[in-house]
């Protein structure tokens, strides 16, 4: 699937998808009017240290993916310190389940859902893939609806909070992680493990794309290397350290390469159509062996 200059993308903003107490979360929905359904769906999750920001960060990516034939959603999620782990993870899973339960009405294919995230968002989408259908982290939105993904992409993510906490705090501030996880590693070690995709990934992981900027001064590229190493025996993984800093996916000098690699990866694993071998639960580890899911 490729972008088309002649394609018009429509955006439906603030579609409610998750209600927690008195708080209603919304998503933005991007659809290309010139493309025919059913379309694979993509969930894009922004960063912000689990504490700041709102949907809209991925607007350019969403428009381009919509032009390439995807139905794209960019959801809100709950933020620290008002909400701690696993609240944001549950919200991302709710967005995935919304795609599966409601996406067909918008021209989406509920059997093909992918996700990409940056920074904190990368942690959330990769962790969502690693804990797919785990009752401990599933929303109450659509009981019985799967939160599994066909493929996932993480940009500049933190994937092992335990290793991150051991870094020199003068170089890498871990206070926001303690705020999100509810304390220090000594106080809540279980949260640091449960929130780390490195510790949660198993053979149910879908194919995964991991990119990290070589000059990232916020999250060290070693975090992505740890994730790639953990996934190596489990699933197909594409890992690369690319030019740029922490915000490389949004930098105009590097944007086209990131977009093209991502859409090519998603097309390979979710763009083949319903009933194909693309997606969660079918493809095995890189050696081509048959692995039960």
Put a short name on every predicted segment.
Residues 1-293:
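Alpha/beta-hydrolase superfamily serine-hydrolase fold, recognizing
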């Amino acid at each position: 699937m490729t972008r088309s200059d002649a394609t018009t993308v429509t955006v439906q903003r603030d579609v409610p998808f998750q209600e927690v107490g008195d708080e209603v979360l919304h998503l933005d929905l991007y659809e290309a009017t010139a493309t025919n359904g059913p379309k694979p769906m993509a969930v894009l999750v922004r960063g912000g240290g689990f504490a700041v920001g709102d949907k809209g960060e991925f607007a350019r990516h969403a428009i381009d993916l919509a032009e390439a034939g995807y139905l794209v959603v960019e959801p809100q999620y709950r933020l620290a310190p008002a909400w701690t782990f696993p609240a944001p993870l549950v919200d991302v899973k709710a967005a995935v389940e919304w795609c599966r339960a409601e996406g067909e009405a918008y021209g989406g294919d509920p059997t093909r859902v992918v996700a990409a995230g940056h920074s904190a968002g990368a942690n959330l989408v990769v962790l969502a893939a690693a804990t797919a259908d785990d009752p401990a982290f599933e929303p109450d939105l659509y009981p019985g609806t799967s939160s599994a993904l066909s493929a996932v992409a993480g940009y500049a993510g933190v994937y092992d909070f335990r290793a991150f906490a051991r870094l020199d705090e003068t170089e890498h501030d871990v206070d926001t992680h303690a705020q999100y996880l509810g304390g220090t590693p000594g106080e809540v070690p279980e949260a640091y493990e449960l929130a780390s995709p490195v510790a949660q990934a198993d053979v149910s992981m879908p194919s995964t794309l991991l990119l990290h900027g070589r000059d990232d001064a916020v999250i060290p590229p070693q975090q992505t290397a740890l994730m790639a190493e953990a996934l190596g025996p489990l699933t197909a993984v594409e890992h690369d350290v690319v030019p740029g800093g922490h915000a490389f996916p949004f930098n105009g000098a590097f944007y086209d390469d990131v977009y093209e690699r991502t859409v090519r990866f998603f097309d390979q694993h979710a763009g083949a159509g319903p009933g194909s071998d693309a997606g969660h639960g079918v493809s095995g580890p890189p050696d081509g062996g048959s692995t039960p899911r």
